[in-house]
Swiss-Prot record:
Its cofactor is divinyl chlorophyll a; divinyl chlorophyll b. The keyword Membrane applies. GO terms for biological process: photosynthetic electron transport chain. This is Divinyl chlorophyll a/b light-harvesting protein PcbG. The gene is pcbG. This low-light-adapted strain contains 8 pcb genes. It comes from Prochlorococcus marinus (strain SARG / CCMP1375 / SS120). Belongs to the PsbB/PsbC family. IsiA/Pcb subfamily.
C-alpha cells in the first residue's frame, strides 16, 4: 500500500482494510459489500429513529429531521404540503433497508471467509477472473472503472424514471407530481455556473438524464479501450496504489460534500422550505458555519437544513485533509520523517549547548 520504505509492510489487525484488503481483489469485493451493509443499516435505523419522533402537527423543517425530508422529496409517505399522510410507506422503507443490511453483511462475510482472497485464483475463463487487478495494469483498472461508471449511470436512470413515472415532491404545488426531464444541453451547460439558483424540477431531471448518458458512454469507453502508448509515470505508472485510490476517493467525497452544503444552505427547490426549514445565513468564526434564520425556533433547536449543511461542510473539510494526507503518502512522503527531523534538531541543539 505504501510507496516509500518497505512496500510489503505488514499491518496489524487494527489497521483493518490496510492489511486485509490491500492488493487483494477478492477482499475488495468483500469490503464493498460490507460497507454497503453498514450504509443500509444506518439509513434504516435513522429512518426508524426519526419516524418515532416525527410530529405531524409541527413543521417538518423545525424538527431537526434529516432522513424523512429526503424520503418526502422522493414522493414517499403520501407527502402533501410538507406533512406525511401515510407513514406506513416510510416504515416499509426502513425495514427493507435493515433486512438488506443483513443480506449485504452476510455477502461481505461470504466473500471474506468463503471465497478466494484474489480473483486471479479463479480460472482464466471465469467472469470473476476478469475483475482481477494489479496497480500497474492500466487496462484492467480502466476495465473496472468502466463498470463503476455503468452503475452510476444506472442510478441516474433510476432516479429520472422514478420522477417521470411515480413523481417527486414539488414545493410550489405542495404535492407529488410526475416530472419530465428537460434535456436542453444549453440549459445544462449554463447551470454549471449558477447551479445553486436552479429552480426547475424539469431542469434537475434533465441534468441527471444527461449524466446518465455521459456516464454510460464513459463506462462503455473504458470497458472497450486499452492504454494507448507507453504506460509511463505521467499516466500513473508506479504511482497507482490502494492509497492513491483512497486519496482520490476522499477528494471526490470532499467535493460533493462541499457542493451539498452550499446547495442545502440556499436552494429551496431541491431542499424545500416546508421539508428542511428556511434558508440559512453564512457566518465566519473559528471556522465557516451556517445558522438558522427562523426566529420561531427555540434557542437550542435547529432545522434539518442547518444539520445537513454544517455536517456536510465539516465532513467535507476532514475528507479533504484525508485526501492530502493519503495523497502525499501515495507520492512517497513518509510522515514519520517529520518526527525524525524534530529529533535531529533536538540532538543538534543538545550538541551545540
Amino acid at each position: 500500500m505504501q510507496t516509500y520504505g518497505d512496500p510489503n509492510v505488514s499491518y496489524a489487525w487494527y489497521a483493518a482494510n490496510a492489511g486485509a484488503v490491500t492488493n487483494k481483489s477478492g477482499r475488495f469485493i468483500s469490503s464493498h459489500i460490507a460497507h454497503t451493509g453498514l450504509i443500509c443499516f444506518g439509513a434504516g435505523a435513522n429512518t426508524l429513529f426519526e419516524l418515532a419522533r416525527y410530529n405531524p402537527d409541527l413543521p417538518m423543517g423545525s424538527q431537526g429531521l434529516v432522513v424523512l425530508p429526503h424520503l418526502a422529496g422522493l414522493g414517499l409517505g403520501g407527502i402533501s404540503n410538507g406533512v406525511f399522510t401515510d407513514t406506513y410507506q416510510l416504515l416499509v422503507v426502513a425495514i427493507l433497508h435493515l433486512i438488506l443490511s443483513g443480506v449485504y453483511g452476510g455477502g461481505g462475510m461470504l466473500h471474506a471467509f468463503r471465497y478466494e482472497e484474489k480473483l486471479e485464483s479463479y480460472p482464466a475463463t471465469s467472469r470473476a477472473n476478469k475483475f482481477k487487478f494489479d496497480w500497474n495494469d492500466p487496462d484492467r483498472l480502466t476495465f473496472i472503472l468502466g463498470h463503476h461508471l455503468l452503475f452510476l449511470a444506472a442510478g441516474n436512470i433510476q432516479f429520472v424514471e422514478w420522477a417521470r413515472v411515480h413523481g417527486i415532491y414539488d414545493p410550489v404545488a405542495g404535492a407529488v407530481r410526475q416530472v419530465e426531464y428537460n434535456l436542453d444541453l444549453g440549459m445544462i451547460w449554463n447551470h454549471q455556473f449558477d447551479f445553486l439558483s436552479i429552480s426547475s424540477l424539469e431542469d434537475i431531471m434533465g441534468g441527471h438524464a444527461f449524466l446518465a448518458f455521459f456516464m454510460a458512454a464513459g463506462g462503455v469507453f473504458h470497458i472497450l479501450t486499452k492504454n494507448y502508448g507507453e504506460y509511463n509515470s505521467f499516466k500513473g505508472a508506479d504511482l497507482l496504489s490502494a492509497e492513491f485510490v483512497l486519496s482520490t476517493s476522499l477528494a471526490g467525497a470532499a467535493y460533493t460534500a462541499f457542493v451539498a452544503a452550499l446547495w442545502c444552505a440556499s436552494n429551496t427547490t431541491i431542499y424545500p422550505v416546508d421539508l428542511y426549514g428556511d434558508v440559512l445565513q453564512f457566518k465566519l468564526g473559528i471556522a465557516p458555519y451556517w445558522i438558522d434564520t427562523d426566529s420561531s425556533l427555540a434557542a437550542d433547536a435547529h432545522t434539518g437544513r442547518a444539520w445537513l449543511t454544517n455536517v456536510h461542510f465539516f465532513i467535507g473539510f476532514f475528507y479533504l485533509q484525508g485526501h492530502f494526507f493519503h495523497g502525499l503518502r501515495a507520492l512517497g512522503f513518509d510522515f514519520k520523517s517529520i518526527g525524525k527531523l524534530f529529533d535531529n534538531l533536538e540532538t543538534s541543539e543538545t550538541t551545540l549547548n
